[in-house]
Regions:
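Gly/Ala-rich phosphate-binding loop of Rossmann-like dinucleotide-binding domains
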Residues: 2
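Short beta-strand/loop segment that forms part of the nucleotide-sugar
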Residues: 6-17, 38
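Residues that form or flank phosphate/diphosphate-binding pockets in enzymes
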Residues: 17-18, 80
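Active-site-proximal specificity loops/subdomain of glycosyltransferases
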Residues: 18-70
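Short beta-strand-to-loop acidic/aromatic patch adjacent to the donor-nucleotide binding site
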Residues: 68-81
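Short coil/turn segments at beta-strand junctions that form active-site/ligand-binding loops
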Residues: 6, 67-70, 95
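Catalytic-site signature of metal-activated, phosphate-bearing donor transferases
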Residues: 48-59, 79-226
């Protein structure tokens, strides 16, 4: 995300995989980023109290960001092309516009790249919880999905617009709580390229689908602790 994003807050909770140490070291090196430790475990299913709800954790972290500032919400299992991300900050023309980012869920198995078969044959077009917005909105609310409790942001009186191109790689299995999951409905990279040939060069730069580059991005995660 550097140097596109030069300041912000990094929320974390209940880390036992070395993430806390990485975050603290990063914030020490780049003091314009503030580490925010949430004092409760976040539980997606059968939460004992609201303090353990994911949306409450999001609101706690968001509370450290000043109102009336532009905010982008990102997750730890995304790796960004900084130039593309920076360009996307110029998409909104008013504080009433919200940029919805697209993504592909990449899965690496035995050094081979696949896409999870989500959305339109692996392409999630301006979908999900990945936004650029002006922070004059209401707090996060709970969102129930498949029995789990997540977060949603009610962006009232806002106009949603799509990103212009894919700006990041999303590796959902890089999160520790997901690394035991097995996905059977996977799309080989070559099949994705063939199916979405119309998107390559328009919504997706070809280099974003280069297998060697994707594997290099994936190897940036410290998976040895897993």
């Amino acid at each position: 995300m550097l140097p596109a994003i030069q300041r912000g807050v990094i929320g974390f909770n209940d880390c036992d995989d070395g993430s806390k140490e990485v975050i603290l070291e990063f914030c020490k090196k780049f003091p314009s980023f503030i580490p925010i430790s949430y004092p409760y475990e976040v539980i997606l299913k059968d939460c004992p109290s609201l303090w353990h709800q994911f949306y409450h954790y999001c609101n706690y972290t968001l509370s450290f960001i000043p109102k009336n500032e532009w905010v982008i919400k990102i997750d730890c299992d995304h790796i960004y092309d900084a130039k593309k991300l920076y360009k996307s900050f110029y998409i909104p023309k008013s504080i009433k516009e919200v940029v919805m980012y697209s993504r592909i869920n990449f899965v690496v198995q035995d050094f081979e790249v696949f896409m999870r078969n989500d959305g339109d044959f692996g392409f999630l077009d301006a979908w999900g919880d990945h936004w650029l917005f002006y922070n004059d909105c209401e707090p996060f609310e709970i969102w129930q999905y498949n029995g789990d409790a997540y977060e949603t942001l009610k962006l009232k009186d806002k106009h949603y617009i799509k990103d212009k191109e894919l700006v990041q790689w999303h590796f959902p299995l890089a999160k520790k709580r997901r690394n035991a999951l097995v996905y059977n409905d996977l799309i080989p990279l070559k099949d994705f390229k063939k199916h979405h040939a119309d998107l390559i060069g328009t919504r997706i730069e070809e280099s974003m689908l280069d297998e060697k580059r994707i594997l290099e991005m994936y190897q940036k995660f410290n998976l040895a602790e897993r």
